Amino acid sequence: GMMVSAFARGYQVLSEERFLKAAEAAADFVLANMVRDGLLLRTYRGLDNEQQAGVSKLPAYLDDYAEMANGLLDLYEATFDLRWLEAADDLARRMVADFWDEKNAGFFYTSAAHKNLLVRTKPFYDGAVPSGNSTATLVLLRLSKLLDNAGYYQKAEAVLTSMRDMMSAQPRAYLNLLCAADFYLHPTREIAIAG
């Protein structure tokens, strides 16, 4: 997902068609080979024998869903091709269904499909790689605006509210979540073009 995002943004900034092609090829590959029955899978191993398809397995984690949905949204914003928006929405719906913590807001790192876990952690720390929770929150906010989805907005708002004190006390630990808070606090602009 992060690669899709990087290439889509690179295309927007530099107008390099090869970046767009790379983003679309990667997104198409993941959606065709790493989604089974609506579930995103974490790994893919191609086989040497060209007669057989590769193997995808292991249920994806929160980071995988959030980053892939975010990459698809960046690709949608670069192309305005609705299939990317629809795919991002599909992943976000599944992410909410499988990872959302109904009691305390936020997303667990693992879904119910992950077996034999002692605990289900809920990491928020944004290090060199943004946390799944911060990216998921940003994805929900973006989709809430693009799709006019109040449910996504309410869940994102619940995450930001629950983390308000932590973000205030240690802002450098939650940089991507602060980006989501910035998106939440500042209104978006909608432009209608008729003609």
Tell where the protein language model's regions lie, with residue ranges:
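Glycan-recognition and catalytic cores of secretory/periplasmic carbohydrate-active enzymes
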Residues: 1-195
